[in-house]
């Protein structure tokens, strides 16, 4: 593992207790007595609060349901993995040899967990203000266009992030049928959650119909 002082420079924060940072970067695969799972648990809660606060202040006219969708689009594995990559966190992780050989340093799940753990460690040592300063700066670097229209464009992704976060399920899409001449064919798609139909839409392609069905489902969920 590389020198942690280099990581601290990337992070913009010097730990008083280096063992806390070591714990945050230690994956459970190492079988060490201390790994980053507990710090990840704490960091997850801290990031959920800070992103919610950030959105609340940034979007003063957006309703609660829409803020929940924005938060789900930012507080998730992919988003946190991107922020971890900005810090080159993968280079500093402590992994088992098996996980190392399996490409663990670039896995979204491992990077995301480590990012949350590091934020949890900073919270323990320096408090909420310091975590806010570091995490929101990173968030804006990775997502310079944090606005409702930009993040909601891909309704399928936004819906999946919301349903995973709130229900623990992933939407499925079922082709009901197609109709019309070949040069102007339309497709009807049903969207299901846990096997129950939530919405249905028609589009000029399967992809468009899926996006429309996801948009309808998002509107229903936020009510």
UniProtKB/Swiss-Prot annotation:
Signal peptide: none annotated. Its EC number is 3.1.26.3. The active site is at residues 44, 116. InterPro entries: dsRBD_dom, RNase_III, RNase_III_dom, RNase_III_sf. It catalyses: Endonucleolytic cleavage to 5'-phosphomonoester. Mg(2+) binds at residues 40, 113, 116. Keywords: Cytoplasm, Endonuclease, Hydrolase, Magnesium, Metal-binding, mRNA processing, Nuclease, RNA-binding, rRNA processing, rRNA-binding, tRNA processing. Residues 154-223 form the DRBM domain. Its cofactor is Mg(2+). One of its GO terms (molecular function) is metal ion binding. It is found in: Cytoplasm. GO terms for cellular component: cytoplasm. Transmembrane segments: none annotated. GO terms for biological process: mRNA processing; regulation of gene expression; rRNA processing; tRNA processing. The keyword Glycoprotein does not apply. Residues 4-127 form the RNase III domain. It is an enzyme of class 3 (hydrolase). Pfam families: dsrm, Ribonucleas_3_3. Homodimer. Belongs to the ribonuclease III family. Digests double-stranded RNA. Involved in the processing of primary rRNA transcript to yield the immediate precursors to the large and small rRNAs (23S and 16S). Processes some mRNAs, and tRNAs when they are encoded in the rRNA operon. Processes pre-crRNA and tracrRNA of type II CRISPR loci if present in the organism. This is Ribonuclease 3. It comes from Campylobacter concisus (strain 13826). The lineage of its organism: Bacteria, Pseudomonadati, Campylobacterota, Epsilonproteobacteria, Campylobacterales.
């Amino acid at each position: 593992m590389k020198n942690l002082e280099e990581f601290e420079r990337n992070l913009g924060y010097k730990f008083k207790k280096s063992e806390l940072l070591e714990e945050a970067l230690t994956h459970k695969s190492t079988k060490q007595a201390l790994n980053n799972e507990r710090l990840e648990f704490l960091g997850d809660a801290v990031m959920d609060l800070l992103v919610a606060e950030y959105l609340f202040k940034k979007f003063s006219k957006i309703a609660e349901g829409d803020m929940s969708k924005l938060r789900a689009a930012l507080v998730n594995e992919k988003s946190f993995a991107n922020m971890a990559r900005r810090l080159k966190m993968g280079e500093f992780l402590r992994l088992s040899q098996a996980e190392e050989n399996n490409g663990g340093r670039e896995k979204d799940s491992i990077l995301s967990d480590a990012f949350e753990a590091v934020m949890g460690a900073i919270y323990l040592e320096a408090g909420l203000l310091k975590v806010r300063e570091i995490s929101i700066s990173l968030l804006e670097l990775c997502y310079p266009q944090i606005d409702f229209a930009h993040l909601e464009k891909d309704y399928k992704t936004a819906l999946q992030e919301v349903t995973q976060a709130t229900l623990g399920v992933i939407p499925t899409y079922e082709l009901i049928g197609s109709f019309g001449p070949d040069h102007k064919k339309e497709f009807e798609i049903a969207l299901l959650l846990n096997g129950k139909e939530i919405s249905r839409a028609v589009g000029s392609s399967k992809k468009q119909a899926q996006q429309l069905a996801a948009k309808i489902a998002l509107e229903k969920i936020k009510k």
